[in-house]
Amino acid sequence: MSDFTMFQNRPITSISEEITQKNSLSSAFKTQFIAVASGKGGVGKTWFTISLAQRLARQGHKVLIFDGDFGLANVDIQLGLMPQYDLVDVLGRRIALGDAIQSCTLGQAKFDVLPGRAGVPAAAGIDSGALNGLLTALRKMSKYDVVLLDLCAGIDPVTRHLSAMSDILLAVTTEEPTALTDVYAVMKLYARDRVRLGEKSTDCRLVINQVSTHRSGQQTFDKLAQACKNFLGWTPVLAGMIRKDTRVPAAIRMQSSILVTTPNSFASVDVARLADRLNIPENASLAF
């Protein structure tokens, strides 16, 4: 019996049980789950997730990218991978979770990827019990310091649930008004979903990508933070800003990371600084 089959046969049916399970896992296993979400597509979310994984792995952390963009997954494409199995196979009980995970090397950094699958509307049939069970299985593997969940753009139920169940939400946006409006909705629903799960705190951090200058990025953050304070009663943390860099598209076309192709570029420096500020504990997954 696969590890996913074992937990899918015991779905979580109540909010109180979800809370109990998450709290017990948090105390026993030290893996940091970081959800990377955005309100709209095209803001660089997946590129950022891969770059962040590469930087954290270079720091010595054991990292897994979970491609949670059900239906439009493309982490494997950006990395040039050709996975034999993926998340849909795990959800369909055709393969064990560990057998679907694939190793990846970018430059001198090594990390793992749990690939998704494009063109399959799998999210419609996934309930919270299956999602919680999947996170449980990943935590119980106890081999990762960080799991980065590259989520679907928007506010579908699966994306919202995975965001709320994570330890940190990195909400990615650009300076464009439409992107800011949409990421505000993501943060608003994230806070609401955390309350629904019985959590008393939120750890929402904003990533502003493709900024013209650090000054314009700071002004964008200040306006959005003020809106959150006025209407939500809390303000997000500024995780960091990434300057617009023409070398990013070139790295994506090469199916590589800009931290490998041009490590001294504006975007590389900004991603590295942002990753360093996350303060991920060393060997967190072995600290229990």
Where do the PLM segments sit?
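Extreme N-terminal, non-catalytic leader segments
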Residues: 1-42, 54-55, 61, 99
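Conserved catalytic-core segment of NTP-binding enzymes
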Residues: 151-240
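Conserved lysine of the Walker
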Residues: 45
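Hydrophobic positions on the alpha1 helix immediately C-terminal to the Walker A/P-loop
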Residues: 48
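NTP-binding/hydrolysis catalytic cores, primarily Walker-type P-loop NTPases
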Residues: 253-288
